[in-house]
A protein has these predicted regions:
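Extended recognition/assembly regions associated with phosphoester-bond processing machinery
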Residues: 1-135
Length: 135
């Protein structure tokens, strides 16, 4: 982990960075001009856990959504972005975090028509309507 932090510091050298803390980041120190639980920029709020009471544009990451779809008879499980109106949930990009199925009750806010999933493939991102995800 120390080597990862050094590598990240080198990558970010000379760049302005903003870091929003999450529950997996309690003992991590990252080079950043801002570090906190929430950050707003140009009317968009970035936070770790979505706030269902805030109806403004928001990007959050806590749930690490995944979707399971059938393709040519095979069940495929992929991390995904979830988008509905003015909200985006980010997928997990690390190997140490799992994923929450988009059909889980915790994500009921995103379980209706109009929600789009963006599944991460090895070389591309695939957009599908949420109703294509297996229940």
């Amino acid at each position: 982990a120390k080597n990862d932090q050094k590598h990240l510091a080198k990558l970010l050298e000379g760049r302005e960075t903003i870091y929003v803390n999450g529950n997996h980041d309690l003992n991590v120190t990252l080079p950043s001009q801002f570090s906190g639980l929430m950050y707003s920029l140009a009317g968009v709020t970035f936070r770790h856990i979505m706030d269902t009471n805030d109806q403004g544009p928001e990007i959050s990451a806590h749930f690490h959504p995944i979707a399971i779809v059938k393709y040519r008879g095979t069940r495929i499980r992929r991390a995904c972005f979830v988008h509905k109106k003015n909200r985006i949930l980010l997928p997990a990009f690390g190997a140490l975090t799992g994923g929450l199925d988009v059909n889980d009750p915790a994500l009921k806010t995103f379980q209706d028509l109009g929600t789009q999933l963006y599944l991460l493939g090895s070389e591309a991102i695939f957009n599908i309507p949420r109703e294509f995800a297996e229940k």
